[in-house]
Each structure stands twice: as structure tokens, then as C-alpha cells.
């Protein structure tokens, strides 16, 4: 019985380590792909958040590579409705807006709006602060959440291929 328990524990630990290793490699690959796609892009996340304000209150924003193409996506909230605003990363202007009506996107938007409902500082303001405090870095994502009942934004920054995440208080 004891040998079986040890074998199961070792197998579980091995599987867990393998999953974590795969996740780290996947995350590294995504970061490398994003860093490469951002080379030469003049539009900042802050400008994208500002542009999206015409469609509602920005509740999250990020650069991402989707189908091999760079995209600047901002979730906004207007009343009780949510939208995904795609900002053209070449011009800094809104390219298209789509309603968020279900699935994981709606779940994420609701959680983000809950965090943003308790803020005194805008997501753009928090992002600008993070960039100002981290010279030579640019923001690639800003995601709000509640920590111990207080709203914070996790701002992911990049300089070349170096990524780091900082927390900014929103209250």
C-alpha cells in the first residue's frame, strides 16, 4: 500500500512538473512572438486605451498576436454592456468594435468591470504611471483585478525581449 502511494505521488509530481514546464515554454514562445511583432510599432497601449474611450470605459487592454497578426484589443464597458474594441496599432484609431455577449470573454469582462467599479485611477492612468516608473519599457497589457478587496492593475511591460509585470493600485 505504501509503495503504491509513493508511486502515485511521484507520478503526480512528474506530471505536474511536465505541465508547468510546458506552460513556461508556451508563455516564453508567446512573449518572444509578441516582442518580435511589437518592433517598430509606434502606437502605445496607453494611446489604445485613450482611443477606446469613445466606445465606453476601458476595463482591460492588451497587445496580442492572433492568427499571426499583431492586434491591440481593449475591453470596454458602457452601462451594463461590454465590447471588444480593436485599435489599429498603426494609426492608433478604433478599427472595429464587437459586442461581448457570452463565453469566457463575458466572464472576464464582468470580473474586470467589478474591479474597475472600485477605482479612483483609470486603467490608462495606472498604465502611464507604470511606464513612467520603468524607463525604456512599454506596456503590453493592463488587467485589473481585486486583491484583498482593493482594485489593482497588473501591467505587463516589455523592453526588447525582457518582460516583467508590475502591480499598480487603482484606489
Listing of model-derived features with the role each one plays in the protein:
Residues 2-9, 14-171:
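Long, terminal "pre-/pro-" and other extracytoplasmic accessory regions
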Amino acid at each position: 500500500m505504501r509503495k503504491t502511494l509513493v508511486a502515485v505521488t511521484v507520478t503526480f509530481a512528474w506530471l505536474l512538473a511536465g505541465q508547468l514546464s510546458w506552460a513556461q515554454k508556451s508563455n516564453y514562445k508567446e512573449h518572444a512572438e509578441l516582442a518580435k511583432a511589437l518592433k517598430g510599432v509606434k502606437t502605445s497601449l496607453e494611446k489604445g486605451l485613450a482611443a477606446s474611450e469613445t466606445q465606453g470605459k476601458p476595463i482591460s487592454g492588451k497587445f496580442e498576436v492572433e492568427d499571426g497578426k499583431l492586434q491591440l484589443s481593449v475591453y470596454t464597458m458602457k452601462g451594463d454592456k461590454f465590447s471588444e474594441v480593436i485599435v489599429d496599432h498603426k494609426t492608433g484609431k478604433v478599427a472595429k468594435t464587437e459586442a461581448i455577449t457570452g463565453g469566457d470573454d463575458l466572464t472576464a469582462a464582468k470580473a474586470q468591470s467589478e474591479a474597475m467599479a472600485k477605482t479612483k485611477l483609470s486603467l490608462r492612468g495606472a498604465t502611464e504611471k507604470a511606464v513612467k516608473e520603468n524607463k525604456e519599457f512599454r506596456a503590453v497589457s493592463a488587467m485589473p483585478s481585486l486583491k484583498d478587496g482593493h482594485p489593482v492593475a497588473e501591467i505587463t511591460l516589455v523592453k526588447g525581449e525582457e518582460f516583467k509585470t508590475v502591480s499598480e493600485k487603482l484606489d
